[in-house]
Amino acid sequence: MKLILAEPFKRLWAGRDAFDAVEALQGEVYRELEGRRTLRTVVAGEGFFVKIHRGIGWGEIFKNLFTAKLPVLGAGQEWRAIQRLHEVGVPTMTAVAYGERGSNPAAQHSFIITEELAPTVSLEDFSLNWVKQPPQPRLKHALIAEVARMTGMMHRAGVNHRDCYICHFLLHTD
């Protein structure tokens, strides 16, 4: 078993089973799939995003392998990617809790909790009206250059973001 807890979870979950505690978190559900749940919650007055993985089964593992993709077995890959991005200076979210238990890769239970990035707007939402209301070329070129810089740093660091879309790039609005 692996368990890493930073505040406020370290204090709030002391003496408790962290896996039971994470499953009990309530909030706005963003994604609910078989074996995986993503939600936004508030703990100690702060916003967090929670991803819980409950195992994907051998069928999903073999399906991924037969299509030449490595399966996502749990939260560990995201935890390691976030740590690596911080090491090389790529701006990204901050993970504050991670847990993984079970040796069977098809049934592994894991979770990751990240601090909410707020206030932000996704680059996708920011650019929605660009067909009707194009931005200044200088702004558009600056955004393209920054996305290219971040993506290049990510790839040079060995991090492969399997769904690298503009909706995952957030602009701070404050």
Description of each model-found segment:
Residues 148:
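Conserved catalytic core of two-component sensor histidine kinases
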Residues 122-134:
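AlphaC helix of the protein kinase catalytic domain
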Residues 16-124, 152, 156-157, 162:
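Conserved ATP-binding subdomain of kinase catalytic cores across diverse folds
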Residues 136-141:
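Active-site mouth loops of central-metabolism enzymes
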Residues 164-171:
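Hydrophobic residue at the +6 position relative to the catalytic HRD Asp in the kinase catalytic loop
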Residues 1-14:
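N-terminal positively charged amphipathic segments used for targeting/anchoring
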